[in-house]
């Protein structure tokens, strides 16, 4: 499964450390190692390398698998970074986190595919993190159900919660 996350408007230049949106996103992703994180941007043209971007958000580090950009004018078809990446990776399951003011193309794409779209009116705050966590749980469960590959919920020898 791929999680598309708007880098420039939800992560870049925001508070860093334990209270920032990158740390909040890392915490949400922790239980889901099978989720590939792809950062998106609104400008035209290639983004810096994955290693450069990892340096900008060290809280996410190796969780960043790829960076995607819009291949056309930034005000047209903003969802193309998603459709292009899905075609290239042949991935069916995805979710996206985008700011409210840039949601029109994403809403249409998510509606067509049934993918969850987390809209952020106030940045990637706690409320958005909770909505993302619930969406990831649903999508990962569905992906595992369809593929027949289930991750163990607990390691051998680990105590189960009462």
Q: Model regions: which residues?
A:
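Short amphipathic alpha-helices and their capping/turn segments at secondary-structure boundaries
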Residues: 1, 26-27, 85-90
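Alpha-helical substrate-recognition element adjacent to the catalytic core
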Residues: 2-76
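C-terminal cap/substrate-recognition subdomain and adjoining C-terminal extension
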Residues: 61-162
């Amino acid at each position: 499964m791929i999680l598309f996350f708007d880098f420039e408007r939800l992560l870049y230049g925001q508070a860093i450390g334990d209270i920032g949106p990158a740390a909040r996103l890392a915490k949400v992703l922790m239980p889901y190692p099978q989720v590939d994180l792809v950062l998106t941007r609104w400008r035209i043209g290639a983004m810096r390398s994955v290693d450069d971007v990892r340096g900008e958000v060290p809280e996410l580090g190796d969780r960043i698998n790829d960076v995607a950009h819009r291949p056309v004018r930034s005000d047209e078809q903003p969802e193309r970074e998603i459709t292009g990446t899905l075609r290239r990776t042949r991935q069916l399951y995805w979710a996206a986190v985008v700011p409210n003011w840039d949601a029109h193309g994403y809403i249409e794409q998510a509606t067509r595919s049934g993918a969850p779209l987390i809209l952020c009116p106030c940045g990637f705050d706690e409320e958005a993190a909770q909505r993302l966590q619930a969406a990831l749980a649903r999508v990962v469960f569905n992906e595992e159900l369809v593929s027949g590959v289930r991750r163990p919920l607990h390691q051998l020898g680990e105590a189960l919660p009462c």
